[in-house]
A protein has these predicted regions:
Chain A
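N-terminal glycine-rich anion-binding loops that anchor highly charged ligand groups
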Residues: 13-29
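Cofactor-binding active-site loop characterized by glycine-rich and histidine/acidic residues
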Residues: 23-26, 33-163, 184-197, 202-204
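Short gly/pro/ser/thr-enriched loop/turn and capping motifs at secondary-structure boundaries
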Residues: 69, 174-178, 198, 244-246
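Conserved thiamine diphosphate
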Residues: 131-135, 189-224, 260-282
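Glycine-rich, charged/polar anion/phosphate-binding loops
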Residues: 153-156, 220-227
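A short, conserved beta-to-alpha structural element at the edge of catalytic cores
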Residues: 163-183
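Short, conserved beta-strand edge motifs with alternating hydrophobic and charged residues
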Residues: 168-171, 208-211, 218, 237-241
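Glycine/aspartate-rich loop-and-adjacent alpha/beta segment that forms the canonical ThDP
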Residues: 228-315
Length: 315, 323
């Protein structure tokens, strides 16, 4: 299934929303209004947007500690998301989660995760629940090439194949040329192979590697895997090569043509009429500004709230 | 409720059947759970089908994590871990994800999974097949820790655990499996957080859990007529029935804690601290802990017995506390 114009515009809008939101997060972190620095998704927007274009509300995702793109693409409310990043009472998780543990069950966004690869076994559980429900909902498990080596991820690939779970594993490989860890060069490689997707065969599932900054390619590959999962034919491992782009692209990228070619927004923009682009940007800027205002105006949790929610009361 | 005599293992099996019949969201998985040699889950696959009762590969991280995920997504998984020592390979899923998600999500998420775990020494199985480790799990915030000591409690506590909306680790000493006791046929709950006064006494309080409850009772029997021993089984370490423990210590003024888990930084120390904080003025003698020293459990049966709490050690401790 290739992209039609309407889908292209939807995906582009999602990518702009993520980029705009994260640029605001960068600024707010610098200003001290978001209390901690954390990993952002700039350069990877096509993956979350292209995958989520196939997802519906009953589908569930498990994410990473670089989660904002996944959460926004799955439909998380921007106000509550921004408030959570500011640690406010009105956030999704009342300021207890922050960027690493955000949960929004109302849209099936079942968790950013602070442990590399930590959400992957749980996401198999979401897929298991979907399989038992019989509604043909699927789960998408996001992780990076670093996370792909974790024992839990390898174990879950095997489990998902043994149980034929309706799950798509999405590995965002952010070291497409030289292997890096946490953005730094490494002396020994962390992957013994060039493509993570090669491991799929060993676990008895299809796997393929794609250009992650090309939204059309992401959309196509994800569509095939998600349709397969929905049809009850089991898991797929998709790998998308991406470049994590640092800094506010609006300013910096103009000086760096090499990086610019990896910018998924720049690439897709060519298919968007200029007026539509301007309108989308203006609308998304307004939404993000509303989220910032909401977050800034929201109260902090009270000290008493530190003690709540360790356990739930019986139903 | 009319009761009849069945084993601890059969009581667990009945609890599974009762809850799976009552609630279609209860699912079971783990290593070999479809096999007839796993007593607690015996016959479940035949009765409830292979969708709800599944064998998992020997990958504790994956299947415990999948249980956590299924629980988050609205199911009530009962996941079996063959031995607690094997859970150590899955500590991220147990201690980070299972235990903390409710809090981290600000209550947006419930994780109503029951992780059933076999525990315990006394079978000459060596240092990675013999531990108790309830203190380790009780230390971490977010887990309810259940330690049944007899067939009646096993059934009632497991039913209560499955119905509870929180993460539970349900720890079954494997030497308890053949132990018989009176158990009602009907489903019933033994509430989490309520201790059992196993034996009333006035001279010395003995707090014991799991298999050690029986050892404590054997010791109390031996001292019958000489020292009046009160034996309390907390039944759950989290939540802990502090009132029952403190009340008893205030009554007797003397405390012995018996724990098969390691001595240091554990349950036995927790109970002594509780007595010091809330019943210090009632204490007439220093509290005594009978627990396994912090030494990996050896294979040789004599060496293993040397380290574990025993009736003889408990008798000596009670005598010392009473003197």
């Amino acid at each position: 299934m290739s992209l039609n114009d309407a889908k292209t515009t939807d995906i582009y809008r999602t990518m702009i929303r993520i980029r705009t939101f994260e640029n605001a997060v960068r600024r707010l972190t610098k200003e001290g209004r978001i209390p901690a620095r954390f990993g952002l998704y700039t350069g990877q927007e096509a993956v979350a947007a292209g995958v989520s274009a196939h997802l519906r509300k009953g589908d569930k995702i498990g994410s990473t500690h670089r989660a904002l793109g996944h959460l926004i693409a799955k439909g998380c409310d921007l106000d509550k998301l921004m408030a959570e990043l500011m640690g406010k009472e009105t956030g999704f998780n009342h300021g207890k989660a922050g960027p690493y543990h955000t949960f929004d069950p109302s849209v099936g966004a079942l968790g950013a995760n602070g442990i590399v690869g930590g959400s992957v076994p749980m996401t198999a559980g979401y897929a298991l629940a979907n399989q038992l429900e019989g509604e043909r909902n699927v789960a998408v498990s996001y992780f990076g090439e670093g996370g792909s080596n974790q024992g839990g991820v390898q174990e879950t690939l095997n489990l998902a194949a043994c149980w034929q779970l309706p799950i798509v594993f999405v590995c965002e490989n952010s070291s497409p040329e030289v292997q890096r860890m946490l953005g730094h060069e490494i002396d020994y490689p962390q992957l013994s192979i060039d493509n993570v997707s090669k491991r799929a065969k060993n676990y008895g599932m299809p796997g393929s590697t794609h250009t992650g900054w090309d939204a059309a390619e992401v959309y196509k590959a994800a569509g095939k895997a998600i349709r397969r999962a929905r049809a009850g034919k089991g898991p797929t491992l998709l790998e998308f090569k991406v470049h994590q782009l640092e800094g506010n692209l609006e300013g910096r990228l103009e000086a760096n043509e090499k990086e610019r070619q990896w910018d998924p927004i720049d690439l897709l923009k060519q298919k968007i009429p200029r007026k539509v682009d301007e309108q989308i940007r203006a609308e998304e800027v307004a939404k993000v500004q509303k989220a910032i205002d909401f977050g800034v105006k929201s109260p902090e949790p009270t000290p008493e709230q530190a003690y709540t929610c360790v356990f739930k009361e019986a139903d | 409720m009319p009761a009849r005599e069945i084993t601890f293992g059969q009581a667990l099996n009945e609890a599974h059947i009762a809850e799976m019949e009552r609630d279609p969201k209860v699912i079971v998985f783990g290593e070999n759970v479809s096999s007839q040699w796993r007593e607690a889950t015996k016959g479940l696959k035949e009765r409830f089908g292979r969708e709800r009762v599944r064998d998992a590969p020997i990958t504790e991280t994956a299947f415990i994590g999948a249980g956590v995920g299924a629980a988050i997504a609205g199911y009530r998984p009962v996941v079996e871990l063959m031995l607690v020592d094997f859970g150590l390979v899955a500590m991220d899923q147990i201690l980070n994800q299972f235990a903390k998600t409710t809090y981290m999500s600000g209550g947006a998420i419930s994780v109503p999974m029951t992780l059933r775990v076999l525990t315990g020494a006394g079978t000459s199985s060596g240092a990675t097949h013999s531990e108790s480790l309830h203190g380790l799990f009780a230390h971490m915030p977010g887990l309810k820790v259940v330690v049944p000591s007899n067939p009646y409690d096993a059934k009632g506590l497991l039913i209560a655990s499955i119905r509870d909306p929180n993460p539970k680790i349900f720890m079954e000493h494997r030497l308890l499996y053949p132990v018989k006791g009176q158990v009602p046929k009907e489903p019933y709950e033994v509430p989490l957080g309520v201790a059992n006064l196993v034996r009333e006494g006035k001279d010395v309080t003995v707090i014991a859990t799991s298999l050690m409850v029986q050892e404590a009772m054997n010791a109390a029997d031996e001292l019958k007529g000489k020292i009046s021993v009160e034996v309390i089984d907390p039944r759950t370490l989290v939540p802990l029935d502090e009132e029952a423990i403190v009340g008893s210590v205030k009554k007797t003024g003397r405390l012995v804690v018996v724990d098969e888990d390691y001595l240091h930084y554990g349950f036995s120390g927790e109970v002594v601290a509780l007595a010091a904080e809330k019943a210090l003025k009632s204490l007439e003698a220093p509290p005594i802990r009978v627990a396994t020293p912090n030494i990996p459990l050896p294979f040789n049966a004599k060496l293993e017995r040397e380290l574990l709490p025993s009736k003889e050690k408990i008798v000596a401790a009670i005598k010392q506390a009473a003197s």
